């Protein structure tokens, strides 16, 4: 520490004085170093006595945390009052996933069924087919489900099936055969599940996968395990298998379905689901669809949904600024403009995120780089014409919660 550094400096000066034959100065430095060494030893003895008298208690939670970090098994979650959490599952997921009540309810029921012991123990916790247009929350629901079940969004294993369109690529899921390149690396699916047996597996864009991929998935759905190229059996029984597809959504498009107006929402949605389900049955084999726990058609997002999603997107953006101690207060007028310009039924929430990036993040980044705002700034974002403007907010206002509604601008 600091005393040790001082002693080293004094010893160095003492040596220099000795070389210059300044013996009186050297003797004085020697005495000073001796005093500091005695002080250092006294502090060290006091610290050792304090450590010896203090008993460190290791609790069950500490042991559970260590086991979780080593094995990837979420011990803390398993030890919690699981029943209460599962009964409140819909409410927690709905706060994050907007406008997809049917999807959230379907997934929640299947998870509860499995955790209650009513599911076949040989099969995964749940298997789902998520269908619908782009940007409606299919991948996002999978990520939030991983966070809810296993306490971490990192428990989501994503496999892009566009990488497995060719027959020769299919073997990479379970590992290359002996003698082939990549044999020592293990399977891109099996190895990740072996290292993290409690996880949500997301197979994205299933319609692009080679037909041989479905033979592998049939074994997972039937037996809950796979044998990789090295002969190891990989357990899938503690995973949730989610497959996504945009099949049928392009045909439906954004122009409605013949015979129904968009205002007749229930009939319109039922007709869309029928079209997408028909397209799914033409694309995937019956023996595969028959083994899936449930198929969910995600609804297209409405303007009201976008208004709710903008709050989630902006909250995530504010969290990214916490490290720099920068706080934003975005006025209702600014939020309304972002929601209005970010609404596109064809592209869903992804278009909203691009709008926020273009109208909010890019201009704010330029302001920060120009030195107009620094760490610790309190920034108010308001609407001015067709753009957002930023100014320093010096008043003692609550930057996280807008207590009073403001007029646009």
Residue ranges and their predicted role:
Residues 1-409:
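AAA+ P-loop NTPase nucleotide-binding core of proteostasis motors
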